[in-house]
Amino acid sequence: MKILVVNCGSSSLKYQLIDITSEEALAKGLVERIGIEGSILTQKVNGEKYIIEEPMKDHKKAIELVLKALVDKEHGVISDMSEIAAVGHRVVHGGEKYASSVLIDDEVMKALEDCVKLAPLHNPPNIIGINACRELMPKTPMVAVFDTAFHQTLPDYAYMYPLPYELYEQNGIRKYGFHGTSHRYVSSVASEMMEKDLKDLKVITCHLGNGASLCAVKEGKSVETSMGFTPLAGLAMGTRCGDIDPAILLFMERELKMSPDEVDTVINKKSGVLGISGVSSDFRDIEGAAEEGNKRAKLALDVYHYTVRQTIGAYTAVLNGVDAIVFTAGLGENSAASREEILNGLEYLGIKIDAEKNKQRGKQIEISTEDSKVKVFVIPTDEELMIARDTKEITVK
């Protein structure tokens, strides 16, 4: 059974065709510059690249070319579109309505439209991608898998902001959390590596990429997470500020005469480690600059590591202990130095790291020592596989 997994951005589209029986990705692809000059599709099959360069005025045209690439006689992996049993779509925001993945119908599409106000940057391209697929593949079942769904198990005292209650009731202002599919995947893999039931474990998962969030998992459920109403909250990130005093925004508007759009650009695109370092939002560049003596680059890393360490400490209190800590995503999987710095200062938890094992990059591995009281894992995330699994579960009766 083959499942197409689609992740639509505003001008890009990532996809994978997964054989769900073997859980193997048969093809992976990226479409860039949709609706912009220089549109390009790059597909990889067994390490071989296949490139299509032609104008793509919209996502429908992009999906057409994806399907064309998948069935291409020379470079494709299927002989006919009918081999695609179902399509799984990554959707950033499901609001309070969806605590799990769902089969897409007209009612679901309306609910996704209603969530646009909660995710104005992300949900519209997700919806456009779904509509394009439904138009081109009308008989193929489609499933929406939400970034927010895993966190719908947060208790009310964890998701409620101390604001007038009407803002929650009337406008849906509360903590939602994101990266849920990733947190769900790596926590389940950690339990497999420990040969224990996830329901018996307390796990802290650290999704550390350009966007970053932590999640506290208890009895297999998310009970706390660092992102909030939007993906801006929580940790310092590549270009996002994370948690700051909200009055700073008022100061920027009133005293610095910045418009709301200008403030938005600063806190979303010019802050985080980029803002502090003045070097880059890429941690590899910042680590390089810090090694060469750039003090602001070192400070940016120190702030970042501190916010992650601080949050891990808080989540051990939320969970009343911790059995495992998991690192995933770009930085979490590949930066031994960052993992070491983050865990440095958490020795009171009984954490001991094997320095040699910690040098591994991008591999699934336990990096704690045998006598460490808390297990520490590096687990490459696989959100696409999780989306494919959910899609199979919902469409195969």
UniProtKB/Swiss-Prot annotation:
- Where does the signal peptide begin and end? none
- EC code: 2.7.2.1
Q: Which UniProt keywords apply?
A: ATP-binding, Cytoplasm, Kinase, Magnesium, Metal-binding, Nucleotide-binding, Transferase
Q: Which residues bind substrate?
A: 90
Task: List the InterPro entries.
Answer: Ac/propionate_kinase, Aliphatic_acid_kin_short-chain, Aliphatic_acid_kinase_CS, ATPase_NBD
| One GO term (biological process) | acetyl-CoA biosynthetic process
Binding positions for Mg(2+) per the UniProt entry = 7, 383
Compartment(s) of residence: Cytoplasm
Which reactions appear under catalytic activity for this entry? Answer: acetate + ATP = acetyl phosphate + ADP
Cofactor: binding comment = Mg(2+). Can also accept Mn(2+).
Kindly identify the residues recorded as the active site: 147 (proton donor/acceptor)
Q: Where does ATP bind?
A: 14, 207-211, 282-284, 330-334
GO MF entries: acetate kinase activity; ATP binding; magnesium ion binding
Q: Which Gene3D superfamilies match?
A: 3.30.420.40
Cellular component (GO) terms are: cytoplasm
> Which cofactors must be present for this protein to function?
Mg(2+); Mn(2+)
Output the CDD domains linked to this UniProt entry.
Answer: ASKHA_NBD_AcK_PK (cd24010)
Family matches, as PROSITE patterns: ACETATE_KINASE_1, ACETATE_KINASE_2
Site, Transition state stabilizer: residue positions: 179, 240
Q: Does the keyword ATP-binding apply?
A: yes
What is known about what this protein does? Catalyzes the formation of acetyl phosphate from acetate and ATP. Can also catalyze the reverse reaction.
Q: What is this protein called?
A: Acetate kinase
> What species is given as this protein's source?
Clostridium botulinum (strain Okra / Type B1)
Q: What is the lineage of its organism?
A: Bacteria, Bacillati, Bacillota, Clostridia, Eubacteriales
